[in-house]
């Protein structure tokens, strides 16, 4: 009798384990069935880059593509959306996720949820060669009301600037990063602000000796980005995190992001739990 009871107990444990191991979120089931995930990206190399044939590459979508493959989702379909419009797109479920260097910020965590960090890096300015206004911090911009800076609406850099005393009237928003660099070249603004590697990539492509890179920016924390999801996709976020951890453990993660200039080590000690209030 004891053997029968023990066998039955073991059977129940196995059934429970199987359910835990193989149960999938409704979101993942849907994505696997349709064969693709719709992903919001911004055209900001090296985070994300839209090729002339429409193919989307870059560190963030390449990581997402690899993670989705592990999860059994065959294709990533990208939708180009500016950073400021990504959260509304996620909330409205126009996209399944966003992956394009969208920094994990406490205020954003009130509207969306994030995966574990996949890309971390410093901030930068582009200025006229010689840095005539000696701009090394956002406080330097704030100290001179005559100065104008450019960045994108909804970007982390906009918030960094406003938090450090830059007036809203000093900010001129660009539509795309290259158009922001064009403003700087034309003298319409005094400084361009964006992620470090994004700014560096733009200046290398522009190849203008009259422009200079200032990196890192003092007084600004290292920014970390992760894949972003609708607030209700907690189970899918957990599945994504498990696959991302697997990708990191195999070394494939480093092989994907390091050619773009990012460091796999930089994400090692980071977690969305410490960057989002209440560990959302």
Model-derived features: positions:
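Flexible hinge/capping segments at coil-to-helix
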Residues: 28-30, 128-148
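Hydrophobic/proline-rich hinge and linker segments of small-molecule sensing/allosteric domains
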Residues: 38-42, 114-137, 227-230
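Ligand-binding cleft/hinge of the Venus flytrap
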Residues: 50-52, 64-74, 139, 154-175, ...
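Short helix-initiation/N-cap motifs at beta->coil->alpha
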Residues: 76-88, 133-136, 172-186, 221-223
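Extracytoplasmic small-molecule ligand-binding "clamshell" domains
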Residues: 23-101, 110
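Periplasmic-binding protein-like
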Residues: 120-124, 204-241, 263-280
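A ligand-binding cleft/hinge motif common to bilobed small-molecule-binding domains
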Residues: 85, 101-110, 160-163, 190-221
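Ligand-binding clefts/hinges and TM-proximal coupling segments of bilobed small-molecule sensing domains
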Residues: 25, 156-172, 212, 244-280
